[in-house]
Amino acid sequence: MSESTGIPQGSPAVGAAGSAPAAPGVGGTECSGAAVGSARIAVKKAQLRSSPRPKKLEKLGVYSSCKAEGACKCNGWKSQNPPPTPPPPTPPRAEQPTAVSLMEPCRSCSHALGDHVTHLENVSEEEMNRLLGIVLDVEYLYTCVHKEEDPDTKQVYFSLFKLLRKCILQMGRPVVEALESPPFEKPSIEQGVNNFVQYKFSHLPSKERQTIVELAKMFLNQINYWQLETPSQKRQRAPDDDVAGYKVNYTRWLCYCNVPQFCDSLPRYEATQIFGRIFLRSVFTIMRKQLLEQARQEKDKLPPEKRTLILTHFPKFLSMLEEEVYSHNSPIWSENFMIGLSGGQIPTVVSAPPVNRSLYYSSSPAPVELAGGGSVSPARKTASVLEPNPGGEKRKPAEPLSHEDSKRPRVVGDIPMELINEVMSTITDPTAMLGPETSLLSAHSARDEAARLEERRGVIEFHVIGNSLNQKPNKKILMWLVGLQNVFSHQLPRMPKEYITRLVFDPKHKTLSLIKDGRVIGGICFRMFPTQGFTEIVFCAVTSNEQVKGYGTHLMNHLKEYHIKHEILNFLTYADEYAIGYFKKQGFSKDIKVPKSKYVGYIKDYEGATLMGCELNPCIPYTEFSVIIKKQKEIIKKLIERKQAQIRKVYPGLSCFKEGVRQIAIESIPGIRETGWKPLGKSKELKDPDQLYSTLKNILTQVKSHPNAWPFMEPVKKNEAPGYYQVIRFPMDLKTMSERLKSRYYTTRKLFMADMQRIFTNCREYNPPESEYYKCANLLEKFFYTKIKEAGLIDK
């Protein structure tokens, strides 16, 4: 199970200089020992994880409570021969000390080491290595607690220390709870700066606009590595500012962005993705001042081609951005900001290990290799503050190129973006659309359309609520919970009222409530099981006089988006005979994707009900899904109309059928080729499934054996390429293709070729042209099409 802890507000920053954090508050300036300290942690973890299993058990035993008979209260095994304090320096390449025997008695309780680690007997190496990583994070935070002088900072260190210590004892996963879960503001800083570039510079020529994009990337990256001043320093520097609000964001930044950079057992987020305008306002002034000051100090180190960018364009960029940051009515901070049709967007800023580098941007940075293997992301970045993209990460996203500058090959049959934009401008412009007024809902509108419009007008609201034993009850929430109890009891008459009351008011259960005119008219009661990877839906109902209005669909869509935000992508529920139809419409089926071992013993079984499941796609915005589908249909319809308008010639109807002909070849229809239709070569599509399978298997084997196939063998790992799955909406790899081929998914060559092409297209979309991945994609693509032609699946 996941462990969580509340973090006190206004806690000072955490550093990572040397073996313990540096004093917080030096905004933006990093200590020279930062990278060394983080690298040291990574090396220690690598060494410990490579130790023999007895040594690992000894290390974990120190943090494991005694399980000997007699209810021993010892909370950790202690050696009879404790190491000296401080320990002697370890000589280079020294052999690891021999692990003690499992029969070695504890200095505290006299029970054997084996009595402390009985719960680890059947634990996998992967899980044990995860726990060992937490152990080293605990030891590091312990040092921080003792060396830190600031009481607020010490308190945060101690809170995180206790959280991780508890996770080791209970073999759980740490969850930091500071006020609420990220993101804390919408739109985010990243989106706001992206909007700013579109709002102010979309009219510029491509090359000039690209300069602005580079400056924006530099600025966003700097925020992700900026060291905030402590609340006390903030109070001294700007006593009139909202220090209380600053403390809240400061604590969030500390827990979600700063500490996880060197304690990687904690979840980590980028500041630009979870904070927004309020956070940026609190740091912008001092940040701008120090950025420009360092730029002037390092101007002699800049190459001539970068001096104008850094010394001239960057100050102007910051001045213009400052106006929008502090303006009360700037459109860039609107969630409904419409991105202009021209210009590229700023890609997601991906965090990466820092390297010592000069002020200017290098397009091909070198990675930092560590003795223990891999690379680390320290708490404080030693690179220059104006560095736009610290190097060393795998598969970093390329800078956006405008359509006229892009030389990347397009997917076969892809529609030009200019045409899409032109069609979009038509279907979104009421003056350009002909036909009757559409103020009323059409007969073919989506089920949730009416509910969506009511939500926009403020007629209905959605709130996730639940009972709490830790906080004073909120009167409004308690009233809503009572309302939910009444709705569920009335709509589910066969369910005992006491049972409904117990679950609705159970602190482990939450309810997504639908509020209209201040009262509850529906809701979905659920319980989340994060460690098992699913959520159980317990009750789902809308009051009878409010049904058939799309509320049920919109309610479920909100629940799906809530779970995507919390990274739980599976729903399970027991549906009775009356609810099966509803759940089927919401994407549920009897084909359960969650392994049975994950949910047996966790969810409630109901007699006469059917277990149904739903797997969520994190790429789908469910509350707007029907709108997106509708718009896609309109785009396709307009594209067809344009194609029809281009075909001016009108042919007479076919008369051959009147003469007794039963069927004709499609290609013999007059004018069919002019519409863009292409005949499929007779030898191209293999009709024998076994022959097709054999041919595709042979091609895939040759592709996987190619020397340039190594980057595409398995799915991209999130920790190797942060943000990859936000940039690439439809990932594909050779391992997935092998599994699909084995399951006979590829019933036609087109499906096979589409997946293979997606691998190459995704790679070129995410990586810069000069990268090794980009080159591998081009070479492997050429090899693939050679083999496809040799197999006779396409024309040579």
From Swiss-Prot:
Region annotation (Disordered) ranges: 1-32, 77-97, 371-408
Localization: Nucleus; Cytoplasm, Cytoskeleton, Microtubule organizing center, Centrosome
The protein's name: Histone acetyltransferase KAT2B
Domain of life: Eukaryota
Listed GO CC annotations: ATAC complex; centrosome; cytoplasm; nucleus
Biased composition (Pro residues): 81-94
Boundaries of every N-acetyltransferase domain copy: 469-617
Biased composition annotated in UniProt, kind: Basic and acidic residues: 392-408
Native source species: Danio rerio
Gene Ontology terms describing biological process: bone morphogenesis; chromatin remodeling; epigenetic regulation of gene expression; heart development; internal peptidyl-lysine acetylation; limb development; negative regulation of centriole replication; negative regulation of rRNA processing
SUPFAM superfamilies documented for this protein: Acyl-CoA N-acyltransferases (Nat), Bromodomain
Catalytic activity from the UniProt record: L-lysyl-[histone] + acetyl-CoA = N(6)-acetyl-L-lysyl-[histone] + CoA + H(+); L-lysyl-[protein] + acetyl-CoA = N(6)-acetyl-L-lysyl-[protein] + CoA + H(+); spermidine + acetyl-CoA = N(8)-acetylspermidine + CoA + H(+)
Higher taxonomy: Eukaryota, Metazoa, Chordata, Craniata, Vertebrata
Top enzyme class: transferase
One protein family per Pfam: PCAF_N
Domain Bromo residues, every copy: 687-791
GO MF, one example: diamine N-acetyltransferase activity
Disruption phenotype: Craniofacial cartilage and bone defects, characterized by shortening and hypoplastic nature of the cartilage elements and disruption of the posterior ceratobranchial cartilages. Morpholino knockdown of kat2a and kat2b leads to impaired heart and limb development. Abnormal fin development is also observed.
